[in-house]
């Protein structure tokens, strides 16, 4: 038996006796029908509980993955790099003329920027993987919905032959598909003409002829007919999928805000549901993480540039270069001048670059060349 097998009971009654002298001869019993011991109310509560569990479990798995990727232990992680960055600035402020402090600040800044960029990249990767999971989940929901519609057709065919014939195994299989779909998304099922009969063990409610399966009032399965969910990747700047339902007149109903539970509901909670006019998600846990990281990086850049701005000057000059001839190479003038290149960058009061000049130095470079 499968995990979704429902207990069944044979309903019997006395068979017509053989009439004889001196009295009737009993011929045992006959099978009237076979019924499922199934309580639809309990089954509905089970599906809801299962949907809640899958929603919570998926969120837990993703958030654990994020925690493992971004540890903030005492000596590792982004927090440690930020603390080192501030300490390097303090050391540089106290010993600004020491070249070692400048090199230390540069190295620690490179470490911090790498960590921020790597964190942003990993969050983007997780964001994309959740979107991939959404596409797979929608495809599975559509597959399950079509299978349920096909089973409904088989149930109608079997039970139309006689009022005493019940398609119990097919109903078990449909319950299995319902439970699987409930793990993915918040669904409601409606079965008209449900029969209640307590003679066969507990509060038995089963059967039901007309069948409807819906997500927040939007019908996916109506008897033998199935209406699929559809995906659109045009609204999002990153090509992330949005979920919609298309009516017969091709009117679209946005489904992301109607899907609130199950594994797919958790995916949308994490990735985001609503896209603005620029194609950016306006909600979602991972979206908030990425936005907060971007805000942190931008704030760090602005405040660091403000430190430089405090020492901004209208002009600069060096020491008098005695005995410096215009045709003398720089490296002949001083052994401290090494081959290489650097940029001279000019910023305005808003921190925007307004001019840049690249200086290249080699063995033949003179002051006239620069």
Place the predicted regions along the sequence by residue.
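Structural signature of extracellular appendage/secretion-system components
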Residues: 1-370
